Design a protein with these regions (language model features):
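Conserved active-site histidine-acidic residue motif and adjacent donor-binding/catalytic loop
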Residues: 144-148, 318-330, 344
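Active-site-proximal region of nucleotide-activated glycan assembly enzymes
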Residues: 184-241
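N-terminal subdomain of nucleotide-sugar transferases
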Residues: 2-134
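A short, active-site helix/loop in glycosyltransferases that binds the activated sugar's phosphate group
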Residues: 32, 36-49, 206-230, 304-307
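C-terminal amphipathic helix plus adjacent low-complexity
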Residues: 2-27, 395-397, 402-501
Length: 501
């Protein structure tokens, strides 16, 4: 079949990497910037590697060209911290860290850069969360400026502020990547490993990494080159934005309500496991009503979901409620949460726990080491939730659906297990004061090959077009190669099919 392969991805990556190394040697830093952005986008989509020390060296070389290394002060303020943030939203971890640092008495310079918008609807919730803290100063970089100009502006802010510590809360490739190598003089740098399953630049430019689960800690150790003593495990709690509950599209009276959903791609596998489980739950339990909240669904996938829901009576008892801004309030009005599979979502799992809701979770055997369910809840206890055995899954489902007291007991157990805000605050201060992990590390065997195969499976399902993306990246560098040939063959086949039928 004419499909994207791991070999195609590696070939494309290596071509772009060689171009970046050559451009850096020639001093063409704008081309380097463009190439690194493309490399980051490619690898983060398929996640077959997690770091690249040679490209980190390229970033350091460009940083030396951009930043005046003699400007930063030798004297630092031990109570000052700079916090880099690319997102500007409450959905990730900025609020948790910033609030803890502010409550501990640190002065914090909160630097927003590369975020999508200014102080608009997206940023309003995080600004409101931070408003009570007078010791947090917010600086928004001008995103209309060129990247390297923003690098100099951020570097100047750091030099003027003279912090003792810097926290980086960002994605794979941003303006901050060029700032980090230039920072020396005893400033301690921490990277919050938010996208632990993704490739990211800069592992060699920070002193410590802060993963939120054992999965991320294992990858940091095995794939990113961090020493054990550099890994400071920091579990987190979800930031709740209170909103008015807007209700459900159908009545829930007399029903047990199961809520499920998240990013659509997390439900894709060769066996249609997730959707098959939902279908069987509907068939087995007539009193069960399932609400599905979907995010990031393409028109093609929307049509596929619509077709699935139209089968038999599924449409009446398996209802798509779309994206919900009032997600916390949704959890308050349901009985059971079921995580997606083969990949689950940590934030949805935590929303269930803080609202005392029990969780159903299934992982297929071939991809169960990415388990995000127990790992985002196991601070005060070690809950047992997920299974790879269908019989055990439906046994637990039956108990949760038919026994209200059992539901409450299981939900209360999860609430007790998850880290609470005050525990997070205290843990963070102890961690960055000692620079030693306060939570024991438990490295374990990860199914790396299965993870790559799953990302390729998503591509082959039609949700992504990695072959077309690689073709677009390569055609300007090489007139003929295996990726371009495969793309052209696929295009010809599609054209013939349109003509024939």
């Amino acid at each position: 079949m004419v499909e994207l392969s791991l070999q195609d991805l590696r070939y494309t990556y290596n071509v772009l990497k060689e171009e970046a190394l050559e451009a850096c040697g020639k001093g063409d830093y704008l081309l380097v910037d463009s190439l690194l952005a493309n490399i980051s986008a490619l690898v983060c989509q398929y996640n077959w590697r997690y770091a690249d020390s040679e490209l980190d060296d390229v970033i350091a070389a460009v940083s030396t060209h951009i930043c005046p290394l003699d400007k930063c002060p030798a004297k630092l303020n031990p109570k000052r911290i700079v916090f880099f943030d690319k997102f500007g939203t409450t959905y990730v971890l900025a609020v948790q860290y910033l609030a803890a640092l502010a409550k501990a008495g640190y002065e914090v310079l909160y630097v927003l850069c590369d975020h999508n918008q200014g102080i608009t609807a997206q940023l309003t919730p995080i600004i409101e969360h931070l408003r009570p803290y007078r010791n947090i100063t917010i600086v928004q970089m001008d995103n209309t400026k060129a990247r390297f100009e923003k690098v100099r502006d951020i570097y100047r802010h750091i030099c003027e502020y003279a912090p003792a510590k810097i926290f980086v809360h960002t994605s794979s490739y941003t303006t901050f990547n060029y700032v980090l190598p230039a920072i020396g003089g005893g400033i301690t740098k921490y990277y919050i490993d938010l996208g632990d399953h993704n490739f990211w630049f800069g592992a060699g430019h920070v002193d410590y990494v802060l993963p939120y689960r054992q999965f991320g800690a294992t990858i940091d150790y095995e794939k990113r080159g961090f020493k054990r003593e550099q890994i400071l495990l920091m579990p987190y709690y979800p930031c709740v934005v209170k909103r008015e509950f807007v209700g459900f599209p159908v009545s829930t009276e007399g029903k047990v309500v199961l809520f499920t959903g998240g990013d659509y791609y997390k439900t894709i596998d060769k066996d249609n496991t997730y959707w098959t489980l939902l279908r069987e739950l509907v068939v087995r339990y007539p009193n069960l009503l399932i609400f599905y909240a979907a995010k990031n669904i393409s028109p093609k996938e929307q049509e596929r979901l619509k077709t699935f829901l139209a089968e038999r009576d599924y449409a009446e008892r398996l209802v798509n409620i779309g994206f919900r801004a009032d997600i916390n309030e949704v959890f308050q009005h349901i009985d059971i949460f079921m995580g997606t599979c083969p990949m689950s979502g940590g934030l949805m799992t935590q929303y269930a726990a803080i609202n005392h809701k029990p969780i159903l979770q299934f992982y297929p055997d071939w991809l169960n080491t990415n388990n995000e369910t127990e790992q985002v809840l196991d601070y005060n206890a070690q809950p047992s939730i997920s299974t790879s055995d269908r019989s055990s899954f439906f046994t637990e489902a039956g108990k949760l659906i038919n026994d209200e007291e059992y539901r409450k007991k299981r939900g209360d157990e999860l609430y007790k297990a998850i880290i609470k805000p005050e525990e997070f605050d205290e843990l963070l201060v102890r961690t960055i004061t000692s620079n030693e992990t306060q939570v024991p590390l438990r490295f374990y065997s990860i199914q790396y090959n299965a993870l790559v195969e799953w990302w390729l499976m998503i591509d082959h399902s039609g949700m992504l077009d990695g072959l077309g993306y690689c073709y677009g990246l390569l055609k300007k560098y090489h007139s003929l190669n295996r990726v371009i040939l495969k793309y052209q063959i696929r295009r010809a086949i599609r054209k013939i099919r349109r003509i024939v039928g």
